Amino acid sequence: MNRAVCQVALENDEREAKNTWRLVFRIAILLLTVMTLAISAAALAYSMEASTPGDLVSIPTAISRAEGKITSALGSNQDVVDRIYKQVALESPLALLNTESIIMNAITSLSYQINGAANNSGCGAPVHDPDYIGGIGKELIVDDTSDVTSFYPSAFQEHLNFIPAPTTGSGCTRIPSFDMSATHCYTHNVIFSGCRDHSHSHQYLALGVLRTSATGRVFFSTLRSINLDDTQNRKSCSVSATPLGCDMLCSKVTETEEEDYNSVIPTSMVHGRLGFDGQYHEKDLDVTTLFGDWVANYPGVGGGSFIDNRVWFPVYGGLKPSSPSDTGQEGRYVIYKRYNDTCPDEQDYQIRMAKSSYKPGRFGGKRVQQAILSIKVSTSLGEDPVLTIPPNTVTLMGAEGRVLTVGTSHFLYQRGSSYFSPALLYPMTVNNNTATLHSPYTFNAFTRPGSVPCQASARCPNSCVTGVYTDPYPLVFHRNHTLRGVFGTMLDDEQARLNLVSAVFDNISRSRITRVSSSRTKAAYTTSTCFKVVKTNKTYCLSIAEISNTLFGEFRIVPLLVEILKDDGV
């Protein structure tokens, strides 16, 4: 039993010893933990320079500052978002359009320069500003429904005058001719001793392009010009813009018009060109072959047109009696009638007078014939000339004129030198270097003054040599490309060359007008051309007009510029 008691006592002692060391271990661990925390806190405070509780007052201020910075950053991000939207939605499409225009401009320029290099022209072709690409020689207003006369010209706009004026009282500048395609070409005649002198004159010829000023204004920039002051008396010149420069057709005159019609040989003619390098060259045409049936032959004064690698000029003059060309027209005539104003004369009498209208007494009874001359455009001037004589069952008595191309359509304007006063535009088709004319568009309110019995209101066939050159420019088209209306500047008087007004015309009536000056201001020839600034979608028309200028010369040639507006109430 004592042994058992001893065994129990020994186990109790061992248990107490274990508990004592366990307590010591726990206390030691606790002390080490507290020391570790204290050391760590001291180290952290030292490394971060921890603030005292009194410093916590500045924390709200710091938070407020941080909030301000975050708000500012968010505002900056909104600005960036706004700029991105503006760039994507607004600026990028405009930049893309401008890039497209520049590329098209470059392609056009490169095309002409390649052509010039191939033809040894020695100079690249200038081109219009990109703003005009797609706006020259195109159908500018395509509208099936609006009243044509709801389109009307603005007041005349100030722009750079690219036409030289007389500098003395006896100086005379007359007979302007203008054409525009890849460039624009202009020419007029210069006489030092009054407008009626036929013995000697100069010919001014210029080449240029359309520009847009920094403020958005349209202006015509002259890049090359020459004054042909030599022994050659060039008259009745027509000009055309071609891929090689400004091509010009002139007659060389040594006598009056009446004397020329009474002669037996054709009038000398010359084909010239002002190149992009500023050099002018010309070549005499073989008129004895080309105009063998003619006694007098002149360019139509109005511009020509570049079509199918050829330049097409209007021509008119007198046929040699009994020549093949003359006999081929014998008995042929056409009668055009005024709108809602029928001639009261007997039909047989009208036919007799219509036939006689082709042989006016002023030119000795010679048949005055309309024609069109085409010349191949190459470095060789006067190459492959082809003369087309349209039948007088389509055309009236031969007169000054103009060949125009608008879109894919070609037209011949014929001055109303005969009995028919309203402006005429013959649709023209070309094939195998020759032209075919078709029944004309007529514009009843677009008249010209004339001597009785062929005054502005005339309605019956008669034999006359009268009128004035005032060409219409095709402006408003149907969607099927047929012509609806034209722009032009006319002399609004029965008999006198007075009262210059601009308007848009349909086949019957005209729009509101823009008057050049007072109704008593003298004027003469006008030639008009329209174009569009594609960037702004604004349509402009240029009328080059001879206007009386009593201080310096009898006439001053003035380029009148208008914008075409729309009256939405019509």
Swiss-Prot record:
Source organism lineage? Answer: Viruses, Riboviria, Orthornavirae, Negarnaviricota, Haploviricotina
Family membership: Belongs to the paramyxoviruses hemagglutinin-neuraminidase family.
Q: Which residues lie on this side of the membrane: Virion surface?
A: 49-570
Q: Does the keyword Signal apply?
A: no
- In the UniProt record, does the keyword Membrane occur? yes
- The protein's organism comes out as Newcastle disease virus (strain Chicken/Australia-Victoria/32)
Instruction: Please describe the quaternary structure of this protein.
Output: Homotetramer; composed of disulfide-linked homodimers. Interacts with F protein trimer. Interacts with host CG-1B; this interaction inhibits viral adsorption and replication rather than internalization.
* The name this protein goes by in its record: Hemagglutinin-neuraminidase
What processes does the entry annotate via GO biological process terms? Answer: symbiont entry into host cell; virion attachment to host cell
> Region (Involved in neuraminidase activity) spans which residues?
233-238
